[in-house]
C-alpha cells in the first residue's frame, strides 16, 4: 500500500480506471456538487477533497495497466464531469488548444500506435452510457460529445451523471471566462494536491485497509466486494449479455428488487462488538455452511478475500451454482430472520420465532448458520425441522441455566452443520443437577427470558386460554427484595423445611442467597413504585394508597397462579421455604419444556 497527496493529474499515468461493472450507481447530489465547487473556487486556500483507493489489477501481457476503484467513485466521477463542463464552456479555439491536455486525463489508448481513444474511467452498468454521453469521444484530436443531451433536456428526473453535468455547466456559465480558465488550470496544476491517492497492490486486503484508514468508521461493504468478484469472474467466463441477465435474475431481484429489499439488506444489526448489515451476515452464514469460513481461524475482514480466492478458481457451472445458492439462502434468511421490537407478539407454537427470540435475548447470533442450514435442508419436512430447532433451543437454555460458557459456540456451530446429532449429545451432557444449581442464583436477564417462555408454555397447554400471544415487555420483580434488611428483618429466616435458623450470620447468608433464586422472581406488567419494592410481602401484594401492588400488575399466570392465588388461599408469608418450593416447581417445568 502506498499513500500520497496528488492532484487530479495523476490520471495521466493511469490506463484503464475501472469502477466495478455491477457497482452501485453514482449518487452525489446538488449539496455535494455545491460543496466541491465552492471549495475549488477559493483559489487562495488549500483544499482536501478526500481520498481515492485504487487497486492494481493483474497485468495482462501487452495491455496497458488497469486499476480498480475501491473507494472514491463519487469524487473521481464528479471531478471528471467538472473538467468536461469547463471544457465545453470554452470557445472553439480554446477547446482546440486544451484538447490535447485534457485527453490525457479523460482518455487512454491501449497502444501508443493506436488512433482510437477509450474513456479512461469505465463506469458501472448503471451509469456507463450516461458517463459516455458526458465525456464523449476523441475525433480528429478534439473531444466531441455527439450524444450529450442539451442542457434544457436534462431535468431532476434524469440520471445523476447528467444532473451533475447540468449543475456544473449552468453554475460555471454564470461565471466570467477568466474564472473558468483559472479553475481549469488550477485543477490541472500538478502542485494542486487536492486528494490523497492510496494505491493498493494486487495482494492487499482492501477491506482491512479501508477499515484502518477510514476514521469516520464508514465500512467498505464486504457484500460489494464479493458481488464484484462474482460478476467479474462471470465476465471472464460468459458473454456480457449473459452476465447482465444472470445479475438481474439472481442478484438484483434478490437484493435490490424494490425499496423494501434495499432497506432490509442494508439494515445493520449488532453481532458481538460489530454492526453489520443483513447482506454481510448472510454471506458469512453461507461461508460457514460451505466450510469456506472458520470463525476460529478467520477474521471478518478476511471474508471477502476468502470468497474472492475461491471464486477465482470457479468454472462457469460452479459460479452459477454459488450465485444460485446465495439467492436461495437469501430468500430463506429474509423469510425467517425476524426483527423484534416492543410491539412484537410471541407465541409458544411459533417454534422458529421462539428460537430466534431466545437467541436474540441472550445476545447469541453464532448459531444462525446452523439454523439457516436446517431451514434449507428441511424446507419440505417441518416435523424434522421442528425437532432439530428444539434440540438447539434446549441446548442453549440448558447451558444458560447451568451457567456454561458460550465461547465455544463458534466451533459447535461448525460441528453441528457437519453432524446434527451432536446437538442432542451436547444438550444431554448438561445434567439436571447443574440446572438445579444454576437457577438458585440466576441473573435478572436470564430469569426474564425463562419465565416469559414458561408463561407462554402454560398458555399454550391450556385449551381454555384464549390469549396465546404476548409482548416481551414485562418487568422482573424480586418478591423478597434485594434490600430486605429494613422491612423484612422481623420475618424469621427458615431453612428449606420451614425450620427457623437461629444463628444470625447463617440466617443472613441464607436470606441473601435466596433473593437471587428463580423461585423468588416473577414478571409484572409494570414496575412497582420504588418506595413499595422493599416493603413487606402484604404491602407489596396489595399496594398502598394510590401505589399499586403486585395484585394490580399480575396479568401473567406465572404471577397470578404462583403468587396471588397462593396468597389468597391464606399463605400470606413469603420466606425461604416458599422460595425453595417455587424454585423446585419451576425447575420441573423447565425440564419438561426443555427436555433433551
Where are these regions (language model features)?
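Glycine- and hydrophobic-rich flexible loops that cap the catalytic core of alpha/beta enzyme folds
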Residues: 1-293, 534-535, 539-557, 563-596
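Active/binding-pocket-proximal capping segment
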Residues: 227, 325-333, 337-346, 391-392, ...
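Intrinsically disordered, low-complexity N-proximal targeting/linker segments that flank membranes
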Residues: 197, 393, 397-514, 518, ...
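A cross-family structural signal marking well-folded subdomains
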Residues: 223-226, 233-457
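Active-site-adjacent bridging/hinge elements
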Residues: 7-14, 45-63, 177-187, 200, ...
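Secondary-structure capping and boundary motifs in well-ordered enzyme cores
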Residues: 68-75, 185-190, 198-205, 278, ...
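C-terminal substrate/ligand-recognition segments
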Residues: 364, 511-530, 579, 583, ...
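Active-site-adjacent structural elements in folded domains
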Residues: 175-181, 188-193, 349-358, 434-438, ...
Amino acid at each position: 500500500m502506498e499513500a500520497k497527496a496528488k492532484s487530479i493529474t495523476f490520471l495521466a499515468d493511469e490506463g484503464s480506471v475501472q469502477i466495478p461493472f455491477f457497482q452501485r450507481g453514482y449518487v452525489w447530489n446538488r449539496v455535494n456538487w455545491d460543496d466541491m465547487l465552492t471549495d475549488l473556487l477559493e483559489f487562495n486556500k488549500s483544499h482536501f477533497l478526500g481520498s481515492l483507493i485504487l487497486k492494481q489489477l493483474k497485468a495482462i501481457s501487452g495491455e496497458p495497466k488497469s486499476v480498480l476503484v475501491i473507494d472514491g467513485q463519487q469524487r473521481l466521477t464528479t471531478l471528471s464531469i467538472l473538467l468536461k463542463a469547463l471544457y465545453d464552456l470554452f470557445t472553439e479555439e480554446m477547446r482546440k488548444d486544451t484538447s490535447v491536455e485534457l485527453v490525457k486525463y479523460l482518455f487512454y489508448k491501449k497502444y501508443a500506435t493506436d488512433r482510437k481513444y477509450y474513456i479512461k474511467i469505465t463506469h458501472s452498468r448503471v451509469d456507463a452510457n450516461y458517463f459516455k454521453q458526458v465525456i464523449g469521444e476523441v475525433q480528429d484530436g478534439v473531444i466531441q460529445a455527439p450524444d450529450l443531451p442539451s442542457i434544457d433536456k436534462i431535468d431532476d428526473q434524469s440520471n445523476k451523471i447528467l444532473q451533475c453535468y447540468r449543475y456544473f455547466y449552468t453554475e460555471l456559465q454564470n461565471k466570467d471566462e477568466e474564472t473558468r480558465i483559472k479553475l481549469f488550470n488550477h485543477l490541472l496544476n500538478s502542485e494542486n494536491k487536492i486528494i490523497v491517492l492510496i494505491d493498493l497492490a494486487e495482494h492487499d486486503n482492501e477491506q482491512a485497509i479501508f477499515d484502518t484508514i477510514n476514521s469516520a468508521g464508514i465500512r467498505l461493504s464486504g457484500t460489494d466486494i464479493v458481488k464484484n468478484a462474482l460478476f467479474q469472474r462471470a465476465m471472464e467466463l460468459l458473454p456480457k449479455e449473459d452476465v447482465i441477465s444472470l445479475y438481474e435474475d439472481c442478484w438484483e431481484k434478490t437484493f435490490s428488487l424494490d425499496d423494501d429489499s434495499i432497506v432490509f439488506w442494508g439494515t445493520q444489526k449488532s453481532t458481538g462488538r460489530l454492526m453489520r448489515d443483513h447482506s454481510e451476515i448472510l454471506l458469512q452464514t453461507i461461508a460457514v455452511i460451505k466450510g469456506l469460513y472458520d470463525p476460529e481461524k478467520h477474521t471478518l475482514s478476511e471474508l471477502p478475500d476468502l470468497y474472492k480466492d475461491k471464486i477465482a478458481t470457479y468454472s462457469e457451472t460452479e459460479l452459477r451454482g454459488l450465485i444460485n445458492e446465495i439467492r436461495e439462502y437469501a430468500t430463506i434468511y429474509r423469510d425467517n430472520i425476524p426483527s423484534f421490537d416492543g410491539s412484537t407478539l410471541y407465541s409458544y407454537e411459533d417454534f422458529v420465532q421462539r428460537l430466534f427470540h431466545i437467541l436474540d435475548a441472550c445476545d447469541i447470533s453464532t448459531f444462525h448458520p446452523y439454523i439457516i442450514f436446517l431451514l434449507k435442508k428441511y424446507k419440505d419436512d417441518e416435523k424434522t425441522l421442528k425437532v432439530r430447532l428444539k434440540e438447539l433451543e434446549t441446548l442453549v437454555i440448558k447451558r444458560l441455566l447451568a451457567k456454561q460458557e458460550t465461547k465455544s459456540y463458534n466451533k459447535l456451530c461448525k460441528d453441528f452443520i457437519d453432524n446434527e446429532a451432536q446437538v442432542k449429545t451436547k444438550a444431554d451432557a448438561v445434567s439436571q443437577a447443574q440446572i438445579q444449581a444454576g437457577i438458585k442464583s440466576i441473573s435478572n436477564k436470564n430469569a426474564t427470558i425463562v419465565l416469559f417462555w414458561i408463561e407462554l408454555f402454560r398458555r399454550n397447554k391450556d385449551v381454555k386460554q384464549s390469549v396465546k400471544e404476548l409482548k416481551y415487555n414485562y418487568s422482573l420483580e424480586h418478591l423478597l427484595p434485594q434490600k430486605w434488611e429494613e422491612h423484612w428483618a422481623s420475618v424469621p429466616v427458615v431453612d428449606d423445611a420451614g425450620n427457623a435458623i437461629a444463628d444470625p450470620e447463617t440466617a443472613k447468608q441464607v436470606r441473601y442467597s435466596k433473593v437471587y433464586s428463580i423461585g423468588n422472581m416473577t414478571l409484572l406488567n409494570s414496575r412497582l413504585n420504588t418506595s413499595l419494592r422493599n416493603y413487606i410481602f402484604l404491602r407489596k401484594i396489595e399496594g398502598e394508597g394510590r401505589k399499586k401492588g403486585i395484585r394490580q400488575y399480575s396479568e401473567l399466570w406465572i404471577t397470578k397462579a404462583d403468587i396471588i392465588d397462593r396468597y389468597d388461599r391464606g399463605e400470606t408469608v413469603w420466606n425461604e421455604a416458599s422460595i425453595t418450593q417455587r424454585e423446585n416447581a419451576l425447575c420441573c417445568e423447565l425440564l419438561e419444556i426443555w427436555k433433551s
